[in-house]
């Protein structure tokens, strides 16, 4: 559901007012700008407050310093300092206009000016080009409030110029559209596609931050279909998915549309509360289908080994985008196991939990539930005949909850014996061998070959 503007829902926080008033008392002009204004108009939670001012950054530092407000020089080449009031940072920037962008990311030069409207004109989108003052009200030279009400992401001025200045804005437009549930305005959309090649000049880490931001909105399903060409530039592995006919009686859609539907379905099954790991896994779960595709003599398509290959490709994509290991590892594992057969039996539950525990220690239970949500979403995004499997997964989930509640064994610490028991029973010296024996015992218990009974496990070690 798209949010609608309703006037600034709450006042500027006291800590930010402290800095703003100090600048005005010294004879300078100051406004709150950026995301705080946009979100306040939408009635959404606001976080960081940014201020723009007619004061040169050196004057900002002097004025606030006289009020015993700490100021850090965080970007003085662009007129930016960061003040800290009551432990909260406030980014304060001098009114400026910008020169050319040779690297398509940063301006080659900036010129400080004394007109806030000129400063707003350099910003990316109309919804981010508004300024607010507690007494003077809203300054909106580019009709950002209208676009908030219409649900549009519109570039300030000439769209192509905005995107050629900073190619990362191409992805920022998609992220804002996803986050707010907006559409991209027509001329801005045309420029997005024309300028998407500029992402080649952007650091992969920055691209990764934006793609991750898109995924975390829960609207990657929409983005894959509405902004395909942009996402192909950001994640080239998406390209082969476009229009790829699966030639399968179980699939009604090409790989891209199937993936889009899976992304949407995980949001439905989780009430919009899917974890980042699940959202990324939904996005990349079938990334290897185009490279593993084969056809049999009847023309039917097969994708043998695509979960395993997809796990490697998922890791490659996410590492290339410099995403953190604690996100990469669970996504890789979810992709690898998304076709793994899970039955509503204690043994199947324990084996699944063991796989996740081995790959992502301490996260097995939450990832097992994420796997079931992924499987549900996958099932309902195929042919209608496959939707019944989603109902079966409900039974598997109930079994998983029962097994976890019963204190099932799937971690080394769940075993009834410890490393010292291994040393005493076998005479082995402390070292890696102890862990190997415990691992073998855990496997035997998980597979139902041995009960998790201390005496039985010790006897088993002595016999060996």
Positions of PLM-derived features:
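Catalytic cores of the polymerase beta-like nucleotidyltransferase superfamily
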Residues: 1-464
């Amino acid at each position: 559901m798209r949010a609608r503007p309703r006037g600034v829902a709450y006042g500027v926080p006291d800590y930010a007012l402290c800095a703003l008033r100090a600048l005005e008392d010294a004879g300078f002009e100051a406004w709150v700008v950026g995301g705080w204004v946009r979100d306040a108009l939408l009635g959404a939670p606001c976080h960081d407050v940014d201020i723009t001012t007619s004061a040169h950054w050196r004057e900002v530092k002097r004025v606030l310093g006289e009020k015993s407000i700490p100021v850090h020089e965080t970007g003085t080449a662009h007129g930016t300092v960061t003040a800290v009031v009551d432990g909260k940072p406030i980014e304060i920037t001098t009114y400026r206009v910008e020169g050319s962008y040779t690297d398509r990311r940063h301006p080659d030069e900036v010129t400080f000016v004394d007109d806030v409207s000129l400063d707003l004109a350099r910003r990316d989108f109309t919804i981010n080009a508004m300024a607010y003052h507690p007494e003077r009200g809203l300054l909106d030279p580019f009709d950002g409030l209208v676009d908030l009400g219409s649900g549009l992401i519109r570039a300030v001025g000439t769209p192509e110029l905005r995107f050629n200045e900073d190619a990362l804005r191409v992805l920022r437009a998609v992220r804002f559209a996803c986050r707010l549930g907006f559409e991209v305005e027509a001329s801005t959309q045309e420029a997005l596609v024309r300028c998407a090649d500029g992402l080649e000049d952007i650091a992969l880490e920055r691209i990764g931050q934006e793609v991750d931001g898109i995924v975390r909105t829960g609207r990657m399903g929409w983005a894959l279909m509405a902004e395909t060409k942009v996402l192909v530039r950001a994640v080239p592995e998406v390209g082969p998915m476009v229009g790829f006919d699966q030639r399968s009686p179980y699939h009604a859609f090409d790989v891209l549309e199937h993936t889009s539907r899976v992304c949407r379905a995980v949001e439905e099954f989780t009430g919009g509360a899917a974890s980042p790991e699940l959202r990324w896994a939904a996005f990349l779960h079938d990334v290897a289908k185009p490279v593993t595709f084969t056809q049999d003599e009847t023309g039917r398509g097969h994708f043998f080994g695509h979960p395993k290959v997809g796990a490697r490709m998922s890791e490659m994509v996410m590492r290339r985008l410099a995403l953190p290991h604690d996100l990469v590892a669970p996504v890789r594992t979810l992709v690898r196991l998304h076709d793994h057969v899970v039955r509503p039996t204690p043994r199947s539950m324990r084996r699944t939990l063991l796989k996740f525990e081995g790959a992502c220690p301490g996260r097995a239970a939450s990832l097992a539930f994420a796997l079931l949500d992924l499987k549900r979403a996958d099932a309902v995004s195929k042919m209608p005949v496959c939707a019944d499997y989603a109902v079966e997964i409900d039974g598997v989930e109930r079994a998983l909850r029962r097994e976890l509640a019963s204190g099932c064994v799937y971690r080394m610490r769940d075993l009834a014996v410890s490393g010292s028991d291994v040393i005493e029973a076998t005479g082995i010296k402390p070292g890696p061998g102890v862990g190997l024996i415990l691992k073998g015992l855990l496997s035997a218990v998980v597979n139902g070959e041995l009960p998790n009974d201390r005496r039985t496990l010790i006897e088993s070690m002595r016999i060996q």
